[in-house]
Regions:
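Catalytic cores of secreted/periplasmic lytic hydrolases that degrade extracellular macromolecules
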Residues: 1-115
């Protein structure tokens, strides 16, 4: 079994729950998790339970959100830290659903793979 398949199997329940709650196809969530977290093996995923590379905004920090500091695009960037992988999946779904940049994605049927 490949690392991608192992990740998908391990986190499928999280992705399916988010699909039912927010309408984001589980396959899309898992694919992004695989890429962003290097199959759950990135430092960000292992240390912060952050599987999607979501950066900590000033409002996240002001609201008491935890964060870790990592060098990514720039040195010493702040990334959200979660108590659990489930919290990471939940925040990812809300991030997509509430961000106007992704609004067009939700105009498509969840099973429309052509767009």
């Amino acid at each position: 079994m490949s690392k991608n398949q192992e990740y998908a199997l391990q986190y499928a329940d999280y992705a399916m729950a988010q699909m039912r709650r927010y309408g984001i196809p589980a396959s899309v969530t898992l694919a992004q998790g695989i890429l962003e977290s290097s199959n759950g093996q990135s430092r960000l995923a292992r240390n912060e339970n952050n599987h999607f590379g979501i950066k900590a905004t000033p409002s996240w920090i002001a609201g008491g959100g935890k964060y870790g500091i990592y060098t990514d695009d720039k040195p010493n960037e702040k990334f959200c830290s979660y108590d659990s992988v489930g919290d990471s999946y939940e925040h990812h779904s809300r991030f997509l659903k509430e961000n106007s940049r992704y609004a067009g994605c939700f105009k498509l049927s969840p099973d429309d793979y052509k767009g």
